Curated annotation (Swiss-Prot):
InterPro entries: ArsR-like_HTH, HTH-GbsR_regulator, HTH_ArsR_DNA-bd_dom, MJ1563, WH-like_DNA-bd_sf, WH_DNA-bd_sf. CDD domains: HTH_ARSR. It comes from Methanocaldococcus jannaschii (strain ATCC 43067 / DSM 2661 / JAL-1 / JCM 10045 / NBRC 100440). Coiled coil: none annotated. The keyword Nucleotide-binding does not apply. This is Putative HTH-type transcriptional regulator MJ1563. It holds the Pfam family HTH_5.
Length: 152
């Protein structure tokens, strides 16, 4: 059982640090980790008890995780409380990567259209920015390809 507790602690630390890297509060990662580790849906109280953090912190973390598509509310017959469970992390990561790629691709296309309309003085500036966005677009395409390959 000691090994399981140590593994659980490592997973919570992993998701907390990943959240931090992405500009989120570490508690967002910890809440996801608890749900990821659980074999059944949990209530806010369950998560509070497990992580020893406030109700407000858990609620805000769950809201953010729901927005990102990493967590969903589940209904349990005969229960009045809200229950939450982790969504498959890989699908969520793919979805986020796709949304980022779509945003980059749209901006790239919009800049290309602007380039056609600008004068010579503006053209050099726009070209430089397009080159940078194009690199981002190529990288995001490769990331999506890799994620799709892993999923097959």
């Amino acid at each position: 059982m000691i090994i399981m507790e140590e593994a659980k602690k490592l997973i919570i630390e992993l998701f907390s640090e990943l959240a931090k890297i992405h500009g989120l509060n570490k508690s967002v990662g910890a809440v996801y980790a608890i749900l990821y580790l659980s074999d059944k849906p949990l209530t806010i109280s369950d998560i509070m008890e497990e992580l020893k953090i406030s109700k407000g912190n858990v609620s805000m973390s769950l809201k953010k995780l729901e927005e990102l598509g990493f967590v969903r509310k589940v209904w349990i017959k005969g229960e009045r409380k809200n229950y939450y469970e982790a969504v498959d992390g890989f699908s969520s990561i793919k979805d986020i990567a796709k949304r980022k790629h779509d945003l980059i691709a749209k901006t790239y296309e919009d800049l290309k259209k602007l380039e056609e309309k600008c004068n010579e003085e503006e053209k050099e500036f726009i070209k430089q920015k397009i080159k940078g966005i194009e690199r981002m677009k190529k990288i995001s395409e490769k990331i999506l390809e890799a994620l799709n390959d892993l999923d097959n």
